[in-house]
Amino acid sequence: MAAVWQQVLAVDARYNAYRTPTFPQFRTQYIRRRSQLLRENAKAGHPPALRRQYLRLRGQLLGQRYGPLSEPGSARAYSNSIVRSSRTTLDRMEDFEDDPRALGARGHRRSVSRGSYQLQAQMNRAVYEDRPPGSVVPTSAAEASRAMAGDTSLSENYAFAGMYHVFDQHVDEAVPRVRFANDDRHRLACCSLDGSISLCQLVPAPPTVLRVLRGHTRGVSDFAWSLSNDILVSTSLDATMRIWASEDGRCIREIPDPDGAELLCCTFQPVNNNLTVVGNAKHNVHVMNISTGKKVKGGSSKLTGRVLALSFDAPGRLLWAGDDRGSVFSFLFDMATGKLTKAKRLVVHEGSPVTSISARSWVSREARDPSLLINACLNKLLLYRVVDNEGTLQLKRSFPIEQSSHPVRSIFCPLMSFRQGACVVTGSEDMCVHFFDVERAAKAAVNKLQGHSAPVLDVSFNCDESLLASSDASGMVIVWRREQK
């Protein structure tokens, strides 16, 4: 049962940063061996109920040993070596639509995360205050964490030395998405409205375009790397999603949209990369099984407008979707069946398209609340607090940017939780990349990068924040190099 072994490995990976804090190579060896054993045992044919029981017990034991997780995202940033070992495969997983086991004993159960969102802040604070010495918690004394993040202020840390490289293979067509590979400093991909996706390598010099993925007949609106970087999923205005092998660039599978509509966004389910959520121009979100090419039964829901942005929380229990009418919907994701249950709706601003959503469980030491970063066409970047386990949002603060019509995106910085303050980065229609400190009450602007000649649509950091990539509406992709202190 491929789905269960991937979930077991995901649980191990989330706790891996707490193992042997001073010997990261042992953590890497451990998680690789776990991956190998789990793949082998997945073929043994054990009863599904036994596997699910093992998954529950494994989670309980790890929780007793290491305590509640503080921030899966920052644990990933701290221990990036675990990601490659969590290989995604296209082995056929259980088809949720046809498997009575998935719909029987567990079909009636509502998904419940380790701790509800309304208790997450208290849990995070308890973890911060009560952990034994030597544990991996972002504090001023966390030397290993500070070594990664740099023992500097935010302004000093996000000073950039200039352009490292400029990619112009998509010139004259907008590049709506640029993303570094997971746990990779030098591998980058970007998609273009010219219908192609570029895979780029930044080292060794000079940076090169390794291959261009072609097959879509219209513009590529979005793409996502799998956890292990061996697969990419792309969505297109040609009403199809495609599954690509990153190693050789071949198209593994083409999947038509269930509604025959333009596909506008996509995201992997973080625990089970066999499932991908897509949003389309007919106002629908669909959970797709990329192993079978089928829509998951119960995994569809309708929004009020064209679906432009998607984001899961780190455990994969909550999904947020934004549309072009200005609404953000939260959905409960059932891990057993892939079913979506609509939970909450927030109208950010009536008629203002929501173009980007990023979720984070722990922003910084000062902001230990689950948060959502949202771009809408309001000339503002919005930071929301997640206040309960159904994804209810409460506005925390906003930052001034220029965005009135373009699909601008933003990100949380991957290493933010290990230093004083916390930084977010966003594109803007003023052709600049903006950095903001979410904890600074006045003068939140930290830095501004100038060099684009068109609105900046997307930004992406590599895993150690040494490089930042930004893409614009004219097809230019700029890779910026951070100053070395």
From Swiss-Prot:
SMART domains named among the record's database cross-references: WD40
Residue windows of the WD repeats: 170-210, 215-254, 302-341, 406-446, 451-484
Superkingdom assignment: Eukaryota
UniProt xrefs under InterPro entries: WD40/YVTN_repeat-like_dom_sf, WD40_repeat_dom_sf, WD40_rpt, WD_repeat-ST_regulator
Places the protein is found: Nucleus
PROSITE patterns for the chain: WD_REPEATS_2 (PS50082), WD_REPEATS_REGION (PS50294)
Keywords of the record: Methylation, Nucleus, Phosphoprotein, Repeat, WD repeat
Main localization category: nucleus
Entry GO MF terms: promoter-specific chromatin binding
Name of the protein in its database record: WD repeat-containing protein 13
Organism listed in the record: Pongo abelii
